[in-house]
Amino acid sequence: EARLTNPENKKLLEEGHALVCLNPEIGHILMGTEDVPYCLARVMREGRLAHTHWNSQPLGNYDQDLNVGVISPEITEAALFVLKMYGYTGYFGIDINPERQPVDVALKICMDALRAAADRINSLDYEKVVWAMMHPDKARGWLEAYLIRMRALHPEKLPPLWELPMD
């Protein structure tokens, strides 16, 4: 982009726009055996995320375009966590090929899956999550135990989570 000479392109760059951006599809990231949150973080770090393209995909190189969150919902949550940490406010596109269900039903399911995952992510105690990530020697296992409780339908049935030594 630094070598562009067209005045319109230069103006867009001066306004803070990127002319080359990515639209990563979750399923294609997985087909490439890449880590979804890490891929999104790399794109965000460079300021090149146009918008996201969501679906579910089993591991393997066969593009199935399943409904969001049907397979490995923790990947959806982790990806949303990364986007939230980067302050992403862009669009969430849905790329599915519903089998044996009407398209409008599949779209509603996908939107519900994204909303439910975002609700779980938004309800996290970010101060504790970041502290645990920054102090792994003092928080061994805490983050995993915390996330299990955040996903549990009845977390009160699990043993209480120990306190972090955040002093």
PLM regions and their residue ranges:
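Histidine-acidic metal/acid-base catalytic patches
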Residues: 1-167
